[in-house]
Amino acid sequence: MPKRKDIQKIMVIGSGPIVIGQAAEFDYAGTQACLSLKEEGYSVVLVNSNPATIMTDKEIADRVYIEPITLEFVARILRKERPDALLPTLGGQTGLNMAMELSKSGLLEELGVELLGTKLSAIDQAEDRDLFKQLMEELGQPIPESEIVNTVDEALEFAAGIGYPVIVRPAFTLGGTGGGICSNEEELQEIAENGLKLSPVTQCLIERSIAGFKEIEYEVMRDGADNALVVCNMENFDPVGIHTGDSIVFAPSQTISDYEYQMLRDASLKIIRALKIEGGCNVQLALDPHSFKYYVIEVNPRVSRSSALASKATGYPIAKLAAKIAVGLTLDEIINPVTGSTYAMFEPALDYVVAKIPRFPFDKFEQGERRLGTQMKATGEVMAIGRNIEESLLKACRSLEVCVDHNELPALSQVSDDELMRKIVKAQDDRLFYISEAIRRGYSPDEIAELTKIDVFFLDKLLHIYEIEQELASHIGDSYVLKKAKQNGFADTKIASLWDMTAEQVRRIRQEQKIVPVYKMVDTCAAEFESATPYFYSTYGFENESVKSSKESVLVLGSGPIRIGQGVEFDYATVHSVKAIQAAGYEAIIMNSNPETVSTDFSVSDKLYFEPLTFEDVMNVIELEQPKGVIVQFGGQTAINLAEPLSKAGVKILGTQVADLDRAEDRDLFEQALKELDIPQPPGQTATNEEEAVEAARKIGFPVLVRPSYVLGGRAMEIVENEADLRSYMRTAVKASPDHPVLVDSYIVGDECEVDAISDGRQVLIPGIMEHIERAGVHSGDSMAAYPPQTLSQKVKDTIADYTKRLALGLNCIGMMNIQFVIKDEQVYVIEVNPRASRTVPFLSKVTDIPMAQVATRLILGETLAELGYEDGLYPESSMVHIKAPVFSFTKLAKVDSLLGPEMKSTGEVMGSDRTLEKALYKAFEASYLHLPNFGNIVFTIAGDSKEEALQLAQRFANIGYGIWATKGTASYFENHGLHVRLVEKIGSDDDKDIPAYIRKGKVQAIINTVGTKRTADKHGQIIRSSAIEHGVPLFTALDTADAMLKVLESRSFTTEAI
């Protein structure tokens, strides 16, 4: 069927902010889809609230709206733009739910807007648990015994009938939100109650648990002419019971027979045809390891996290083709862009093994609940490609950036056998390492399989890795064993530790013996057809397929997996850097390990190496490609940490030089630089042990801010008030960065702001100053930020511009740098300098219209600001007000305290823009799902030193009609100052009348809770905060954020005064 001519303008809905369960894979999908539709000649309108995405760049769609994805705003845009059609299946669960809401509101019908791609009825059938069950029964497809429930009592009654364990799956939620496995009545009561609350239709499926079955996924495509194919099938290392987003996954499936493969393939195709899905779809199945019995677990009728993995694993661009199918093209008409010669109807074939390992946030949240279940907890993932399972698994392990270069955590050698077995049976995020340790201790694969239900085949591969370790240890220097180890994915550093030499020595031995990697092409067809994709992975075999270009090239290092502190913003900068390299006439090469992102789409760069970002792997690529130099500024801390070893190995680092990077990152050198440049900073000292830290703090005076040097996202950063807390910090937290000392700084309570600057070494362009809404003490990544600044005097702005220029030139910055300031009594202090692109680059690029990463890259390659048409100094401010607001994933992370402080906790961001501060704030709150009604009850539970300020907020809330409730100390302070409040207990003896009870009953509309300086003793506060998160009640732990929300409410309310 030719593409449709009756539609001209199509609206695409993005997926909004990054949260656990919905990450960068939707930026990749949305970007591909918009470009694909434009390629076919359609006009594209995009709506997304997340500025840190490539898809919200002006050139991706014809009209880009960075607005909240809520009915109110999407309806306005629909009325204004009047598109002919809407494509919702590329915006994750957010896009689907929005389409359902628009349809139910009658607006699509009123405006004559057609839904493209998969029809609403099919989305409903796949997402509504009852309809899905009916369809499967009609198709004769087996599903586990189950019951749809709308109340907790119904859930308990059904479970009593079929017996425990049971699985709870809420309808229309993302990443298993609110679900879980329940072994008894008590657990079911809790999980079902929570699941019903989180489901937008108050519906859950309770089903018999089939935990222990193999989990197999099929990524399938279908077009309007009923052509359907399997793009990729994948097997989870972990059996059913652990969310697929938290499982290690291999593609293609490794342990199923051809008969089983065909049986599950037929089932998947039968389901996609019955649902009449047009585009991509993911089918999850459970296979009994002891028979040919299987169950259908669920179907995602949209592009998903698995689609991104399948696209990168096979090279087959699912989202791009799904968009073409949506406008009527069929798979047998679309040319596969990878081969350029076969049609998209051709099923990909793989002659390699792909491993995906999730990246979890527990290095940030040590107190978080690490047990894995049906609710997703990973923030990101890595992918690695190899010729065998061992190679791809070990490459993926070292891509994780959790300080391991192998499937081994050194600390586990100290763990008792009992503890080891416990951790293996009760799966946590690090179970792979515990299983590997058990194998090293002599437990057999069969014993471990019995305990974990993981297939013996995979455990045998772990045993094989251990056998090679032993061979290496007993054959030091042996080239035959060295080659075997390299063919099975061993890193030089691991071999060096077994041979008791340096990695450099191992590398030399390898090179002398000509044991070097070759690079193979990912071509979707197992080399059956000619292919020209510049997409490569390394292996130790024969025949290198990557040929060094005749053109001069530049290598850009990506930022690896998405984690808290290093998100999609860095991928955004990487992609823009590549565009600038190409525009300057060079060949751009990207190296990265993250399957979710735009940077690892092979059509972005001239060459893509899907490899771990370690010194060894990067050097191997450099030796083959011989680039002009390497750019490390855009890959976050991952890339910056590689600058020094690469430079020592003689590699040219482009942009700011290593010695200058060091001056910004090393505390003593930085202090010296600031003194020379005459720039004030809060008084501080470095300490290498506990006594030095205590001595420094006494000298400076408490409170002090303590942190390790060289970290990202405020890892292990704390504000300490007294010596006892400082000693405890030094004993527990300093392992964050053992080679570097701890910084002890005077903690200044002031207004914080930050600047991104771009310098060519002579002139400095400052695109803008962002003012944080929360005062110093909340990590910059968790603060709301306003551009242009709303309260800074001209004098302060001038000082900031002056200090920025001095710093950029004084530290010989070429390219980009980020500086954070704190302002107290009009005095400006520098808190820190990052000599690289920061997480604010996409936001600031969007609001100033300066493509900052592109400009910085051109300067890194030798051009000047003047040549690019930019002037020295602070760029003129925008007339609009733009707010960047953080978004958190606390609902997914049990036991993680939602209290904001100097360590970063947010997973994503949104932007709100309008002509006034209040309107921009309103949009930012709406986009980040912080919605406050115009009236209701608000609870204040406030620490001693903030009561005076809280009283002013409470009075303002009372003026607009809110009922003020407060806990004991806060209530008496408010009453003493003439404000009438209702007294409530924090955590009461009568658990029907305390704050969590009122939250459960829906009596509380918001909570404002601050803690004193002894944050640790705040057990009750943590229970209240968790309760608010669980029930979706807006929670403010910084008074400044509550003040911003009040501004919005006040601007929306009319003044009603008696005369």
Curated annotation (Swiss-Prot):
List of residues binding Mg(2+) 3? 820, 832
**Binding of Mg(2+) 4, residues:** 832, 834
* Entry keyword set: Amino-acid biosynthesis, Arginine biosynthesis, ATP-binding, Ligase, Magnesium, Manganese, Metal-binding, Nucleotide-binding, Pyrimidine biosynthesis, Repeat
Region of interest: Carbamoyl phosphate synthetic domain: 547-929
Main enzyme class: ligase
Under PROSITE patterns, the record lists:
ATP_GRASP, CPSASE_1, CPSASE_2, MGS
Residue sites binding Mg(2+) 1 per the record: 284, 298
Region: Carboxyphosphate synthetic domain, residue numbers: 1-401
EC number, as in UniProt:
6.3.4.16, 6.3.5.5
Write out the residues that bind Mg(2+) 2.
298, 300
Q: Which residues bind Mn(2+) 2?
A: 298, 300
Q: What is known of its domains?
A: The large subunit is composed of 2 ATP-grasp domains that are involved in binding the 2 ATP molecules needed for carbamoyl phosphate synthesis. The N-terminal ATP-grasp domain (referred to as the carboxyphosphate synthetic component) catalyzes the ATP-dependent phosphorylation of hydrogencarbonate to carboxyphosphate and the subsequent nucleophilic attack by ammonia to form a carbamate intermediate.
This one is known as Carbamoyl phosphate synthase large chain
Protein source organism: Streptococcus sanguinis (strain SK36)
Phylogenetic placement of the source organism: Bacteria, Bacillati, Bacillota, Bacilli, Lactobacillales
